[in-house]
Every structure is written in structure tokens, then in C-alpha cells.
Amino acid sequence: MCHLTYGETMVTLIVLGSVMTLVFGLERIVPLGMKRMPSPRRFLATDIAWFLVAGGAGVVVTLLLAPLLERTAVGPIATLLEIAPTGVQLAIGVVLYDLASTTIHRAMHKSDVLWAVHKVHHSSRELDALATTRAHMLENLVRQVPAQTVLFVLGFSGANVALVAVLFAGWAVVGHSNLRVGARWIEMLFVTPRVHHLHHVPATSQRNFATVFTAWDRVTNRFVSVRSAPWDEFGVPGEVESYPQRFVDAVREPLKEIHGRRHARLTA
């Protein structure tokens, strides 16, 4: 198995940061964006902090957990995978990673505890590239570890799992961005910014769970393609105005909510 070194891990994070910076700039050019972005951007410091948290979570998963997860590989399947070209491995990896991530994402909307954690991601009032990494550190582990475990069990090397994660994250950045993707035929297969933005609108937050492929939502009757108007409001359903936007408050909010639910059950 091929492990990623610390240096290679940092290069991966730099590449993702560069992609996010590029998209962040392009989406603010009026002809390229779906709507004019507010200037200055609200809660910029908060989302930079969440970006750093996401980077830290990536380092932990890659350097500490990945070497352990590689040991879960099922021999016969891993042998078959090893003879496949790298491009085929990556394509299979992205499909499986997106399926696993979509399944976990739907679970986060169904479980009260996981939803309390996932609310942080839905709290973005404006969607752009930087909104991609607005996610609680607990969510980073809940979303990344199971999805990567699926690949490791099938025999993917640490390096290829990292490449799959980079491709997935890059598409997530585009999906959260304000970029205008005009060709509707693309949405027959892929999630576009227009499609994913509908998931962040409270009225349709139970739709469009996938990050890369629309097929997962189509086969479960969860896909919606109603046109997202410029005035659609993003935010946590029922808490659009009240959910904390400051970083420290948002870090504590899921823990407070989970503790409150537990206390209510014990005293009921």
C-alpha cells in the first residue's frame, strides 16, 4: 500500500485551497456568476476559520486514520482492483465515495443528533466556494471516515483514496459556488451549483443530497430541479435568522443542542 507523507498531504491541501481561491474569484465576475455576490462578503472570518478546521480534519484522517483503515482491505477484491488502470480506479472511487457520502448526508438529516451537527453547514446565508468547508469538526469525521473506509475495504491505496477525496472536494467547491453552469443537460448526470443550491434553500433542504452525481437523488425520488431564483434565502430551516454565525458560537451550538435534548429526555 502507498501511504501519503506529511508533505504530500500538505500539497493536497494547498491544491484544494488554490482551487477554492480560483473559484472564489471567478464566481464574483458578474457574467460568470448566477447572481451578484455581496461585497464585502459577510462572515468571511467565520468561514476562513471553518476552512482551517476542514484542513486540520483532512490531516488527521490522512495521516492518523488512513494507515489503520488500509488494513481493512479485503484481499480478493483488492487484487482485482490492483490490475485496473489508475483512471478506472479513480472513476470507481468517485462513484462509490459519492454514494457513501450521499447516504451519510441523508442520515444526517434524519437523525436529531447528526442534524444538530449538520446545521452548521446549512447556516451559510450566502453560498460560494468558501461555504463548502463550513462544517463542524464532528461532521468532517462523520462524513469522511465512513466514505473513505468503503474505499479502503475494497483495496484502494492511501494515495488513490486521497486523489478521490480531492476530486470529490473539488466538485463540492464548484457545487457550492455561485458559478453559472448554463447547460441543463449536464444535470442529467452531474450536480451543478444551481442544483445543489436548492438543497440549501429551507423549502427544499430534504432534496438534492448528492455532491457529484444526480443519479442517487433521482433513484430515491429526492431530486428537484425547480429554478433557484436570486432571492431564494439560504439557511437552517426554521432558524435562518437565529442560528449563530460567529465561529465560536457555532462550534458550541451542536453540543448545546445535543446536551439540551438529552437533558429534556432525562427530566421528562
Which residues does each PLM region occupy?
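A membrane-cytosol interface segment of integral membrane proteins
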Residues: 232-268
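Membrane-water interface of transmembrane alpha-helices
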Residues: 20-32, 103-113
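Structural signature of hydrophobic alpha-helical transmembrane segments
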Residues: 10-24
